[in-house]
């Protein structure tokens, strides 16, 4: 059973997803932050399989947030810019959805020859999510065909390459 994150998966969790949470002003690290973190390296196997840019994903997530607030009568422009959130040292608290993605990524990585959890295992875990999860809603909004992404990941090199 895989027990360690690959270097790229560790960077995803400890740096990129945390950076996305901080950038968005969120106090907890969620599935949407993990998805955005996967898109930081547009040349990675996970990002190529998704076929979505980081800029497009950020814009779509911002639009989803604005729409949710507008549905209850709040206009985001009236709120102004919030102060950046500081997590101090270490990882911000994980949402329950993000914790579930970690468990699922471990399950996805079990058959791995390398014994490591790769970024593609996180992507496979994120693809299994359903609405109302934020990452699932973002994937749907971006028009990501989950079956096609899974096929791309199952191609040469399987889910092992980051």
Positions of the model-derived regions?
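Histone-fold recognition with a strong bias for associated Lys/Arg-rich disordered tails
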Residues: 1-162
């Amino acid at each position: 059973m895989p027990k360690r994150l690959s270097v790229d998966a560790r960077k995803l969790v400890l740096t990129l997803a945390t950076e996305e949470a901080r950038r968005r002003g969120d106090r907890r690290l969620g599935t949407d932050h993990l998805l955005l973190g996967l898109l930081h390296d547009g040349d990675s196997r996970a990002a190529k399989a998704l076929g979505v840019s980081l800029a497009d994903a950020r814009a779509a997530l911002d639009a989803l947030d604005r729409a949710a607030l507008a549905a209850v009568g709040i206009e985001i422009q009236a709120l102004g810019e919030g102060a950046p959130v500081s997590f101090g040292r270490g990882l911000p608290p994980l949402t329950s959805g993000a914790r579930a993605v970690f468990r699922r990524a471990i399950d996805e990585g079990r058959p791995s020859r390398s014994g490591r959890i790769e970024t593609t295992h996180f992507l496979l875990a994120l693809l299994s999510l359903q609405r109302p999860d934020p990452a699932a809603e973002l994937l749907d909004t971006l028009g990501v065909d989950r079956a096609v992404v899974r096929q791309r990941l199952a191609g040469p090199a399987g889910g092992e390459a980051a």
